[in-house]
From Swiss-Prot:
It catalyses: a phosphate monoester + H2O = an alcohol + phosphate. Residues 407-420 are cytoplasmic. Its EC number is 3.1.3.2. Disulfide bonds join 156-369, 211-309, 344-348. Homodimer. It is found in: Membrane. It is a single-pass type I membrane protein. The lineage of its organism: Eukaryota, Metazoa, Chordata, Craniata, Vertebrata. This is Testicular acid phosphatase homolog.
Length: 420
């Protein structure tokens, strides 16, 4: 009997040994990690006109991180500590990690909560016996200047031109027409005006209802389970149109491709300049993750949940080359899903990864962002500016000539009279 049990357990033991050995090997070869995550649970971005609750239910106001969101981000930090405990120093080392956030309260607070879970102070870093937390820097830039993490950028007219083209596509029109009656009905309930395209108000309504339901707040009678489900479907389709359906590579070059390019450049700096940096953390939004995954061609079509995290790991192989593995943590009950770049199995050689990403990386973002109309306007404006400057210079030159002549007359003529 014992012999039979041993025989039955042998395959499982070897399997576990193989998994453990493989994991240890990958950990030993790990060189650099990038973690891009969405902020935690928040209050609604806005309310709809007929919302019976309005802003009064949210203690810190609309758009703000909730206590549940803080807990979610803290748990994300603890997950990252468990996963990279043998890679990162056990104590905070400013040379090993760099954290950047978009300039929003909820993302800045999410970054801080995650760092609290990743780097609980110990030893000499305990600065107060009653506070098991330490301040760690989180960097940001003004939202109006953030092209790395906040998409789409308002100063990219070509992107909005692409979206106007997208909504003219038959696939888009067919979907919108199928929801026409539904959207008219919801518009009446919410106080919005029904439109022929999927307006942002549809997402606002869904977002408000989702947040209220998540916090056990009663929904209006018209917001049945079927209504909320359809609103979710419409919102997901609307999101999909921003990264798929019509000129996807060009859309990516103007949005998520910017972040892909930055990640590759940062890794190149780490390798070529022998930088001690081991991890980059980006605290951002669902739109950031969608744009990134859209550029990578791994977007699953689902809305990224709170605290979802896209991880990119860079490894050094035995032959000196590097490879890339990607993981997506969109739930907490299981380990992250491994993602494979289309056309390259995981782990993907870095050279192949870079080549596959080339079509979504812009060589001149400002130029690519200029629509035909805005480019012509800019050229016309430049020509007008040159003409105006030429006229001003001409007038100024003529004025100076007249003034000099007058001065010459004033000081030169008396001398002539004296000589005479």
């Amino acid at each position: 009997m014992k012999r039979a049990v041993v025989i039955l357990w042998l395959p499982l033991a070897f399997t576990n040994l193989y998994i453990l050995t493989t994991f240890c090997q990958r950990t030993d070869n790990l060189t650099f990690v990038v973690a891009v995550f969405r902020h935690g649970d928040r209050a609604p971005i806005d309310t709809y006109p007929n919302d019976p609750h309005k802003e009064k239910l949210w203690p810190n106001g609309l758009q703000q991180l909730t206590q549940e969101g803080m807990r979610q981000q803290y748990e994300l930090g603890r997950f990252l500590r468990r996963r990279y405990d043998h890679f990162l120093s056990s104590t905070y080392n400013r040379q090993e990690i760099y954290v950047r956030s978009t300039d929003y309260d909820r993302t800045l607070m999410s970054a801080q909560a995650s760092l609290a879970g990743l780097y609980p102070p110990n030893g000499s870093q305990l600065w107060h016996r009653d506070i098991h937390w330490q301040p760690i820097p989180v960097h940001t830039v003004p939202a109006s200047q953030d092209r790395l993490l906040k998409f789409p950028s308002k100063d990219c007219p070509r992107y909005y031109e692409l979206m106007r083209e997208t909504i003219q596509q038959p696939e888009y029109q067919d979907k919108v027409n199928s929801w026409k009656d539904f959207m008219e009905r919801i518009a009446n309930y919410t106080g919005y005006r029904a439109e022929t395209t999927i307006s942002r108000w549809v997402w606002k309504v869904y977002d408000t209802l989702f947040c209220q339901k998540s916090h056990n707040i009663s929904l209006p009678s018209w917001a049945t389970a079927d209504v909320v489900k359809t609103l979710k479907e419409i919102s997901a389709f609307d999101v999909k149109t921003h990264v798929e359906m019509h000129k996807t590579n060009e859309k990516a070059r103007l949005t998520g491709g910017i972040l892909v390019d930055a990640l590759l450049r940062n890794f190149s700096d780490v390798v070529n300049k022998s930088l001690p940096l081991k991890m980059l953390m980006y605290s951002a939004h669902d739109s950031t993750l969608i744009a990134l995954q859209g550029a990578l061609k791994v977007y699953n079509g689902l809305h990224p949940p709170y605290s979802s995290c896209h991880i990119i790991e860079f490894y050094k192989e035995a032959d000196g080359t590097h490879s890339v593995r990607m993981f997506y943590r969109n739930e907490t009950v299981r380990e992250p899903y491994e993602l494979a770049l289309p056309g390259c199995d995981s782990p993907c050689p870095l050279l192949n990864f870079t080549q596959l990403m080339a079509p979504v990386i812009s060589m001149d973002w400002k130029k690519d962002c200029a629509s035909d109309g805005s480019l012509q306007y800019r050229i016309g404006s430049e020509n007008n500016t040159v003409l105006a400057l030429s006229i001003c210079v001409g007038i100024l030159g003529l004025t100076l000539t007249v003034m000099l002549f007058c001065l010459w007359r004033t000081y030169k003529l008396p001398v002539r009279r004296y000589q005479r």
